Regions:
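A structural motif
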Residues: 60-61, 72-95
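Activation targets extended, charge/polar-rich intrinsically disordered C-terminal tails
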Residues: 96-157
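Extracellular cell-wall/glycan-interacting regions and their flexible linkers
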Residues: 43, 48-49, 54-74, 131-133, ...
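Glycine-rich catalytic cores of cysteine/serine-nucleophile enzymes that process amide/ester linkages
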Residues: 6-70, 96-105
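Loop/turn positions that initiate beta-strands
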Residues: 1-3
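Exposed alpha-helical structural elements
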Residues: 13-17, 74, 78-82, 140
Length: 157
């Protein structure tokens, strides 16, 4: 069994700033559940939300790489349960500042995109990277984990 994530190569000003600060090609991470729902901590709506299309709220023409993380059925159930419990929680702007200042700034009741993915993996007993806390996980780090496997690329419409 596995879960998938969508790694966006955003084009907006905010996306370019995120890519510069995190020194990577990705500006956003969304979690793709197996029932065609997509969960993302999205600064555009200030919360963790559910969408049904990878293009929802994203600029047309944005490249998106899809990655997969293998896990057992119990792990996948724990992952999904944790992700769904976070829907509606606020966006973690303080956590983004933590990347800029290279500090541990974050709020444990709020999420930014890749932090939510990493925390969900940890909740399911799937560590993405050794010695890296969820709040330290950028979209770039999520994609270079030995647990993530590139599947394909798409472009938003």
């Amino acid at each position: 069994m596995s879960i998938r994530i969508a790694q966006y190569k955003g084009k907006s000003f905010v996306s370019r700033v995120i890519k510069k600060i995190t020194r990577g090609e990705y500006s956003h991470t969304a979690i793709m559940l197996d029932d065609n729902r997509i969960v993302e901590a999205w600064e555009g709506c200030d919360e963790v939300r559910i969408i049904t299309d990878l293009s929802d709220g994203h600029k047309p023409g944005t490249p998106v790489d899809i990655y997969e993380v293998s896990m057992g059925s119990r792990q996948e159930g724990n992952f999904r349960e944790f992700v769904e419990a976070q829907v509606g929680k606020e966006y973690d702007y303080l956590g983004l500042l933590g990347f800029y200042f290279n500090s541990g700034l974050h709020n444990e009741e709020k999420w930014f995109c890749s932090e939510l993915f990493a925390a969900s993996c940890l909740h399911a007993d799937v560590g993405l990277l050794n010695n890296v806390a969820a709040y330290q996980t950028s979209p770039r780090l999520a994609s270079v984990s030995p647990k993530t496997k590139y599947i394909k690329s798409i472009v938003t419409v």
